[in-house]
């Protein structure tokens, strides 16, 4: 015979088991990241449910009417099993979101990584094209500004001519003895080229070549008694 209060304990255990199954089903339906293995509560939920079903069936066998709690637990277990089968069929052949290896309890189905990678590559290509166009526009604008600045600047001053190194002047030889010899040679040539007519021939020519004596027109005093000239 059933002890009083035991149905309440069984109902509480069934509620806990149904809550665990509901959480498991919600996690399987959740597309978010999952752990590679089942948790501690998820692993113990099927055992608890099996023990609870065994207890309820044993009590129902002693009664003529199947309790409603047993039907509720069986329905919850069937729903959890169906959800697990659907989740397993959906995740069959999927790959790991981290390593890319196929596994049974994958986060993403097969092909999701390829699609994501293709979309990422397309987005990167579009960003590169947009950045390239903007960079070219900036370069053209900078060239125009530089040309305008060059036009405003004054012309550069002419570069100074290259400095020439002075040439080395050869040392002059002493010109004293050479000049003396040259002067002596010139004097000898001048003396030899003088004509013989320039030399005086005799005393007559000496008188002729002499300069005439200037007459003194000053009146000289005449002594008394001397005849005065002036007549023939």
Swiss-Prot record:
UniProt region (Disordered), positions on chain: 1-47, 153-178, 191-232
Composition bias type Basic residues, residue spans: 211-220
Compositionally biased residues, Basic and acidic residues: 19-31
Family statement: Belongs to the FAM246 family.
Protein name in UniProt: Protein FAM246A
Organism: Homo sapiens
Lineage, top ranks: Eukaryota, Metazoa, Chordata, Craniata, Vertebrata
């Amino acid at each position: 015979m059933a002890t009083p209060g035991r149905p309440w304990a069984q109902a509480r255990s069934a509620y806990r088991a149904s809550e665990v199954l509901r959480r498991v089903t919600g996690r399987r339906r959740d597309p978010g990241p999952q752990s590679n293995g089942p948790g501690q509560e998820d692993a113990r939920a099927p055992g608890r449910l099996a023990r609870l079903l065994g207890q309820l069936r044993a009590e129902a066998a002693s009664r003529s009417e199947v309790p409603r709690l047993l039907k509720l637990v069986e329905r919850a277990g069937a729903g959890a099993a169906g959800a697990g089968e659907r989740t397993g069929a959906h995740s069959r052949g999927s790959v790991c979101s981290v390593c890319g290896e196929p596994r049974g309890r994958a986060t993403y189905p097969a092909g999701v990584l390829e699609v994501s990678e293709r979309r990422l590559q397309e987005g990167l290509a579009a960003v590169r094209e947009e950045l390239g166009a903007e960079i070219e526009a900036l370069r053209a604008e900078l060239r125009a500004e530089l040309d305008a600045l060059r036009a405003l600047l004054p012309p550069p001053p002419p570069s100074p001519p290259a400095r020439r190194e002075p040439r080395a002047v050869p040392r002059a030889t002493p010109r004293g003895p050479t000049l003396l010899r040259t002067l002596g040679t010139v004097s000898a040539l001048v003396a030899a080229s003088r004509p013989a007519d320039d030399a005086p021939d005799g005393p007559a020519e000496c008188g002729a070549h002499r300069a005439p004596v200037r007459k003194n027109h000053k009146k000289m005093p005449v002594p008394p008694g001397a005849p005065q000239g002036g007549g023939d």
